[in-house]
Regions:
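Single conserved hydrophobic/aromatic residue that forms the stacking wall/gate
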Residues: 1-9, 171-173
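Residue-level detector of anion-binding/catalytic polar loops
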Residues: 98
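Catalytic cores of secreted or luminal carbohydrate-active enzymes
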Residues: 129-130, 136-143
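Acidic/His-rich active-site region of diverse nucleotide-sugar glycosyltransferases
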Residues: 6-72, 95, 106-118, 122-128, ...
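Acidic donor-binding loop at a coil-to-helix junction in glycosyltransferase catalytic cores
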Residues: 57, 81-87
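Boundary detector for helix-to-coil junctions that initiate low-complexity/charged tails
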Residues: 140, 146-156, 163-172
Length: 173
């Protein structure tokens, strides 16, 4: 059963990927895959062009059954700006439903145009509260890693590159 679906979201320049799924752990909490990849470039195993399960997708372009939205309580109000979509997807996955990225439709998105950047002390404080709230709600996946992401790949970049050799332990598979 597919519950949440998201498409390829391109940045305002119309030629590069802005959102193509979310990996828990990118940037410490969660981040988007393939940021800045040009639409003509190949991605890691061409994943940017393949439908696939992810732990989360962006709400910039998300579809979900209303019944599931109601069952999980919708978006968490304590996550007013950041991580509310990721938290929602995590709640959906907890029900045993799938979160799927499908690159068949493309949306052009002007990220942060309406709300702006975290460029004031108040916005930075809100963002830090939302990081703490998300971390408190989902400590296990933050500790154990994203089940849809190979632990031998880096969490510092969104390009699926190998981790630093010093940090690679025995493969989990």
């Amino acid at each position: 059963v597919i519950c949440v679906w998201s498409s390829d979201v391109c940045s305002s320049d119309l030629d590069t990927i802005q959102h193509a799924g979310v990996v828990i752990g990118f940037g410490g909490i969660a981040g988007h895959t393939f940021i800045g990849l040009h639409k003509s470039e190949n991605s890691y195993f061409n994943r940017a062009m393949c439908a696939q399960d992810y732990s989360a997708v962006t709400a910039a372009c998300m579809m979900s059954k209303r019944s599931v939205f109601d069952v999980v309580g919708g978006f968490t109000e304590e996550l007013a700006v950041a991580f509310n979509d990721i938290d929602y997807c995590m709640k959906v996955r907890k029900l045993g439903k799938l979160v799927v990225y499908a690159p068949y439709a493309v949306l052009h998105h002007y990220e942060s145009k309406s709300r702006g950047l975290e460029d004031t002390p108040e916005k930075v404080a809100r963002f830090n509260r939302e990081i703490a709230t998300f971390a408190k709600r989902w400590p296990d996946i933050l500790k154990n890693g994203d089940p849809y992401y190979n632990p031998n790949l880096t969490l510092r970049k969104s390009n699926f590159a190998l981790r630093d050799r010093k940090k690679i332990g025995r493969a989990s598979w």
